[in-house]
From Swiss-Prot:
Photoreceptor required for image-forming vision at low light intensity. Can use both retinal and 3-dehydroretinal as visual pigment. Light-induced isomerization of 11-cis to all-trans retinal triggers a conformational change that activates signaling via G-proteins. Signaling via GNAQ probably mediates the activation of phospholipase C. Pfam families: 7tm_1 (PF00001). The keyword Disulfide bond applies. It comes from Procambarus clarkii. This is Rhodopsin.
């Protein structure tokens, strides 16, 4: 690292030999081959506290191992358990795959840059790194959108809704990846660009350039990849209303008949579907918690850049990377049939509880109904 950190790197690029913002800045730690990608805004900040890098490295090591292991197990269990190979669960597998790919491509480079305290992997890989991060994040959110639409179709529309088939689920997944690639490949063709973040340990979209072309990309990307996917909120409101009406009807009918409960096979099916909807809602909520900081960084960079320092830019992708860990944990804890399959295939990782027997019965009913719908 001493090869580029002992002298200001600006001299070799024809820039003023004296830094107007101070004797040594965070940019002076960067290799010369990426200086043309760094916005002048970052020249006014001193290097980050050296303790930030080992802390970030430890965090990435912890989340990287958890994410890769958790999502690999999720994919393996779903694909090797016949009762879990339903059209709806193809979306779950796609979600785990996008999370796995995100950490598989983000984790090793972050370890390297944290070790050297700056981006050392060259300008080309900086662009590839940012592209892959955006691509996997975009695929994750749109997968959650389609999972929500499927739950809405099953719970709110019921028998009136068209059952999800393998062909339709596959078409949805293809749409997700085509949409994601289309948006994320645009910066390679001049609509915005991928550049090093202010902390110089990662790369992302350019939110500091003031030209209309760069900003228009961020406006459109934010709309299609963040704001538009907020539509599932409407679906969840409808789901909650449908579940509340169903439960009230069950209680009223049981009261009239003088019995404790009307829970039968159909009611168990509805209960299992509602649990799956809660899982999806939790996962979507965690996704927005994870990606909102990065969105805020982009918008602050466009309209209030004076508040944006290199340290603040770390939190955006720290939260974003942590999102890839949430999903396998949510499904492992909340999906009865997944727990049952993991209990059988990987007893050392099981988390089965005493109440799982009843939940598993209800979940089996749901899966059977889905399989019948698929074959119809």
């Amino acid at each position: 690292m001493s090869s580029w950190s002992n002298q200001p790197a600006m001299d070799d690029y024809g820039l003023p030999s004296s830094n107007p913002y101070g004797n040594f800045t965070v940019v002076d730690m960067a290799p010369k081959d990426i200086l043309h990608m760094i916005h002048p805004h970052w020249y006014q900040y001193p290097p980050m506290n050296p303790m930030m890098y080992p802390l970030l490295l430890i965090f990435m090591l912890f989340t990287g191992i958890l994410c890769l292991a958790g999502n690999f197990v999720t994919i393996w269990v779903f694909m090797n358990t016949k009762s879990l190979r339903t059209p709806a669960n193809l979306l779950v597998v796609n979600l785990a795959m996008s999370d796995f790919l995100m950490m598989f491509t983000m984790f090793p480079p972050m370890m390297v840059t944290c070790y050297y305290h700056t981006w050392t992997l060259g300008p080309t890989f900086c662009q590839v790194y940012a592209f892959l991060g955006n691509l996997c994040g975009c695929a994750s959110i749109w997968t959650m959108v389609f999972i929500t639409f499927d739950r809405y179709n099953v719970i709110v529309k019921g028998v009136a809704g068209e059952p999800l088939s393998t062909k339709k689920a596959s078409l949805w997944i293809l749409t997700i990846w085509v949409l994601s690639i289309t948006w994320c490949i645009a910066p390679f063709f001049g609509w915005n660009r991928y550049v090093p973040e202010g902390n110089l340990t990662g790369c992302g979209t350019d939110y500091l350039s003031e030209d209309i072309l760069s900003r228009s990309y961020l406006y459109d990307y934010s709309t299609w990849v963040y704001y538009l996917p907020l539509l599932p909120i409407y679906c969840y409101v409808s789901i909650i209303k449908a579940v509340a009406a169903h439960e009230k009807g069950m209680r009223d009918q049981a009261k009239k008949m003088g019995i404790k409960s009307l829970r039968n096979e159909e009611a168990q099916k509805t209960s299992a579907e509602c649990r799956l909807a809660k899982i999806a809602m939790t996962t979507v909520a965690l996704w927005f918690i994870a990606w909102t900081p990065y969105l805020l960084i982009n918008w602050v960079g466009m309209f209030a850049r004076s508040y944006l320092s290199p340290v603040y830019t770390i939190w955006g992708y720290v939260f974003a990377k942590a999102n890839a860990v949430y999903n396998p944990i949510v499904y492992a804890i909340s999906h009865p049939k997944y727990r049952a399959a993991m209990e059988k295939k990987l007893p050392c990782l099981s988390c089965k509880t005493e109440s799982d027997d009843v939940s598993e019965s209800a979940s089996t009913t749901t899966s059977s109904a889905e399989e019948k719908a698929e074959s119809a």
